Amino acid sequence: MKAEVVAIGTELLLGDIVNGNAAWLGQALAELGVDVEQMAVVGDNVARIAEVLGAATRRADVVVATGGLGPTQDDLTREALAELAGVPLERDPEIEAALRARYAALGRADFPPMNLRMADRPHGAVPLPNPAGTAPGLRMTVGNAVIFALPGVPGEMREIFRRWVAPELAERAGPGTVLLSRVLRTIGVWESEVADALADLDAELALRGNPTLAYLASEGQTRVRISAKAANRDLAAAMIAEVEERARIALGDAVYGADSDTIEAVVHRLLTDAGATVATAESLTGGLVGAALTETPGASDVYRGGVIGYTVAAKVELLGLAPELIAARGVVDPEVAVVMAESIRSRLGATYGVATTGVAGPARQDGKPVGTVYVAVTAEGGPTVRDVHLSGDRQRIRRQAVNIALDLLRRRLLNLPPEPQLRRRRS
C-alpha cells in the first residue's frame, strides 16, 4: 500500500513551526507496513491545496493530510477537499451539536460563530471524532485513493490517527505487511566512518532488498536504522536480530545504545550501576555538560555539581589553576583540561571529573584554530584526554563537544579505549 503525507499551513513554509507531524506520521505509517513514497508541504491556499492533494491521490492509495481544519479564515482544507471532489460543503448537525456541547461543558455560555466552520464537511466525507480537541478529522474517497484529513495540532492528530486511521490501514494492509525497525545509536564517529564499517553488510542487504539500512547523523551521533518487512512481527524481529548482531560487531564500542536510548541516560545508568559520582569543570561548553548530566531524573544521586570557569580569572580562583601553567600553555590545552577535571573532582569529592576547553569561534585563541577541543576525564587511575577538531558554527561545536565529553565518561566507566574502534571495510 502506497501513501503520501501532505502538511498544510503557510506557517510551515515560513519555518515558524517545525513539521513534526510529518516525521511522526512517517514512522507510524511505516510500522503499519504502509510505504510512504512522498511528503509535501503546501500553504493556505484553496487551489494549491486541492492541486497537491489531487496529485497525491493519483499516485498513492492513501493520503494523510494535516492542518487547515480549525475555525479561522486561513483553515482551508475543507474547502480544498470540496473543490477537489467537485462537491459542496455541508453543515453537519451532529458535528455542530458536539461542538456546542463541548463548549458548554467547558463553562462557555457564548459559542463563537466562527467555530461553526468546523461543522462543515464536503458532501460524502465522513467525520472522524476528535476526543482530544474540537476540530474533527475527515475521511474522504477521491478517485481510487482515500484521504484522511487530520488536525494540525500534534496531540489531536495523533489521537485521531491511532483511533480511526491506524485500524483501517492495518485491516486494509492485511497479513504479510508488518514492518519493524531497530535503531542502533553510535557516538564519536562520523557518518562516513559508520557507513564504511557497514559497507560490506550494506552491499549484501542491497542485493537482498530486505532488511535495509539507513543512516541518520546529527551533532556527533549517527543512528543506524535496520528495517525489515515480513509476514509477522516474529519473522521481522528475527531478520533484524541477525543484521543487528553483524552491525554491532562492525561498529564495535561506538554503539552506546538502541532505539530511544540517549547518551545522557546511558551515562546516568552506568554511574548508578557503578555507585559513582561525577563533577564538571567547563569552559568551552559553558555548563552544557552539567545540563546534560542533570537531564535524567535522579541526577542528584550521581552528579555532584560543576563550575563554569569561562575566564582565566575564574579558572584560577574557582578551580585553582596555576597562573604559570596558563601563561605557559594558554587555556586551550590538554594539560589545562586535565588540571580542571582533577580540581573539580577533588573539590567536590566525586569519583570522576570531567572538563572541557577549546575554541568555539569565531576567532582563533592561543594560536589554536576554531574547532579545537580538549576533553578530560580524571579518576583514581589517572586522566584520559581526547583532542578533536570539530567543524560548524559556535553552537554546533559546543553541542558536539558535549557529546564527546559524555562519551569519554562512558568509555572510562566501561574501561574502553578513549576513541571508538570500528572495523574497516575489507579491501
Swiss-Prot record:
It comes from the Bacteria. It comes from Acidothermus cellulolyticus (strain ATCC 43068 / DSM 8971 / 11B). This is CinA-like protein. Belongs to the CinA family. InterPro entries: CinA, CinA-like_C, CinA_C, CinA_KH, Competence-induced_CinA, MoaB/Mog-like_dom_sf, MoaB/Mog_dom.
